[in-house]
């Protein structure tokens, strides 16, 4: 991998990690189109630490408040004593499904499911489910029913959105895409669904990145070029990711996710055509 490739992959990761279009799909598709080697699941997991940093920086006040409140609640023997403490436990609960499924299906995630056929199918299927979620939200608003805010997220919402996050282990699904879709199906507002999605990503992305970094440390440090490429890609993804978070939260205040649905359908169909025509290999 060249330094230019590392920078481009970092930009791709930062742009697509938080938009519901799948960063893993793009990190798999674009190298295939460009004739580069597949960067691999480990590379993808490690550079996500950059986008993890973007979430921590953007939501730093929320995170500090949640951590402080959870600690206070534990000290006082009342874990759910306020909204911030409750949110901390909802994030913890929502993380359980992806941990369980990630450990159970780790081999398949890193091999079989990285096939471009799986990715194209995931792009299309989630677009259809997200379209259904948007229809449900539109109908609810037309009937005059309110949408849920962060304060309304309870155990049921946290666990179900956590299950949606576990589906994102299938490359092409999009972690933000599945969790935002899950939130919309549970009647969260678009902005609330996105905000909870980003906060929910923290434990899972940190754990995956740290694990892959530990597992591949000897391989990475064996070549100074590997260290440089990973560092550059990670930093680039963090900078671009921060801008993507700001964009999406602002965008969803007054827009639906229709543009992302259309993009996913076009990308999935286009990928199938390229595979069918032999332009790229699965």
UniProtKB/Swiss-Prot annotation:
GO MF: undecaprenyl-diphosphatase activity
Principal location listed in the UniProt entry: membrane
Subcellular locations according to the entry: Cell inner membrane
Domain of life the protein comes from: Bacteria
EC numbers: 3.6.1.27
Record keywords: Antibiotic resistance, Cell inner membrane, Cell membrane, Cell shape, Cell wall biogenesis/degradation, Hydrolase, Membrane, Peptidoglycan synthesis, Transmembrane, Transmembrane helix
Record's keyword annotation contains Magnesium: no
InterPro entries noted in UniProt: UppP
GO term, biological process aspect, one: cell wall organization
Pfam families: BacA
A GO cellular component entry from the record: plasma membrane
Annotated membrane topology: Multi-pass membrane protein
Record-annotated membrane-spanning stretches: 1-21, 39-59, 85-105, 115-135, 153-173, 193-213, 229-249, 259-279
Catalytic activity of the protein: di-trans,octa-cis-undecaprenyl diphosphate + H2O = di-trans,octa-cis-undecaprenyl phosphate + phosphate + H(+)
Claim: DNA-binding is one of the keywords in the record: no
NCBIfam families xref list: undec_PP_bacA
Further comment found in the protein's record: Bacitracin is thought to be involved in the inhibition of peptidoglycan synthesis by sequestering undecaprenyl diphosphate, thereby reducing the pool of lipid carrier available.
Classification via HAMAP family: Undec_diphosphatase
Family, as annotated: Belongs to the UppP family.
Biological role stated in the UniProt entry: Catalyzes the dephosphorylation of undecaprenyl diphosphate (UPP). Confers resistance to bacitracin.
The protein's name in its UniProt record: Undecaprenyl-diphosphatase
Lineage: Bacteria, Pseudomonadati, Chlorobiota, Chlorobiia, Chlorobiales
């Amino acid at each position: 991998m060249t330094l230019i490739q590392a920078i481009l992959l970092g930009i791709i990761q930062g742009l697509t990690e938080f938009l519901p279009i799948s960063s893993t799909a793009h990190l798999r598709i674009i190298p295939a189109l460009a004739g580069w080697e597949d960067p691999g699941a480990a590379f993808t997991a490690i550079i996500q630490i950059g986008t993890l940093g973007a979430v921590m920086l953007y939501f730093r006040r929320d995170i500090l408040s949640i951590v402080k409140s959870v600690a206070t609640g534990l000290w006082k023997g009342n874990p759910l004593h306020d909204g911030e403490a409750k949110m901390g436990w909802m994030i913890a609960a929502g993380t359980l499904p992806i941990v369980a499924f990630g450990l159970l299906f780790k081999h398949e995630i890193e091999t079989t499911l990285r096939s471009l056929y799986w990715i194209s199918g995931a792009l299309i299927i989630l677009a259809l489910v997200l379209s259904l979620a948007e229809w449900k939200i539109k109908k609810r608003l037309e009937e005059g029913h309110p949408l849920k805010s962060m304060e309304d997220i309870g155990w049921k919402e946290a666990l179900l959105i956590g299950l949606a996050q576990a589906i994102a282990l299938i490359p092409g699904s999009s972690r933000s895409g599945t969790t935002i879709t899950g939130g919309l199906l549970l009647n969260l507002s678009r902005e609330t669904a996105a905000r909870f999605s980003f906060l929910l990503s923290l434990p899972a992305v940190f754990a995956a990145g740290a694990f892959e970094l530990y597992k591949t440390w000897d391989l990475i440090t064996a070549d100074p070029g590997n260290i440089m490429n990973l560092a550059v890609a990670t930093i680039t993804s963090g900078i671009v990711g921060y801008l993507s978070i700001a964009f999406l939260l602002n965008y969803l205040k007054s827009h639906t996710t229709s543009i992302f649905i259309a993009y996913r359908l076009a990308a999935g169909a286009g990928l199938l055509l390229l595979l069918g025509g032999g332009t790229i290999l699965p």
